[in-house]
Amino acid sequence: MAQRTWLGDILRPLNSEYGKVAPGWGTTGLMGVFMLLFFVFLLIILQIYNSSLLLEGFKVDWRSLGQ
């Protein structure tokens, strides 16, 4: 038998929804939208780093970060 601890008593409400699944797709669509937005964000950062996306007055150089 598991021993009761004060930490377990505090964390028990967080585990009260264990095993319950929302019917249907739930928030899967919303998660997909956020994944797409995060992908676009990473793509823009990569293009700035590779100088594929040109921004006026913005130099991509490691030495400029130290100034």
UniProtKB/Swiss-Prot annotation:
GO terms for cellular component: photosystem II; plasma membrane-derived thylakoid membrane. GO terms for biological process: photosynthesis; protein stabilization. It is a single-pass membrane protein. GO terms for molecular function: phosphate ion binding. Keywords: Membrane, Photosynthesis, Photosystem II, Thylakoid, Transmembrane, Transmembrane helix. The chain crosses the membrane at residues 29-49. It is found in: Cellular thylakoid membrane. Its main location: membrane. Pfam families: PsbH. Belongs to the PsbH family. One of the components of the core complex of photosystem II (PSII), required for its stability and/or assembly. PSII is a light-driven water:plastoquinone oxidoreductase that uses light energy to abstract electrons from H(2)O, generating O(2) and a proton gradient subsequently used for ATP formation. It consists of a core antenna complex that captures photons, and an electron transfer chain that converts photonic excitation into a charge separation. PANTHER family: PHOTOSYSTEM II REACTION CENTER PROTEIN H. PSII is composed of 1 copy each of membrane proteins PsbA, PsbB, PsbC, PsbD, PsbE, PsbF, PsbH, PsbI, PsbJ, PsbK, PsbL, PsbM, PsbT, PsbX, PsbY, PsbZ, Psb30/Ycf12, peripheral proteins PsbO, CyanoQ (PsbQ), PsbU, PsbV and a large number of cofactors. It forms dimeric complexes. This is Photosystem II reaction center protein H. It comes from Gloeothece citriformis (strain PCC 7424). The lineage of its organism: Bacteria, Bacillati, Cyanobacteriota, Cyanophyceae, Oscillatoriophycideae. The gene is psbH.
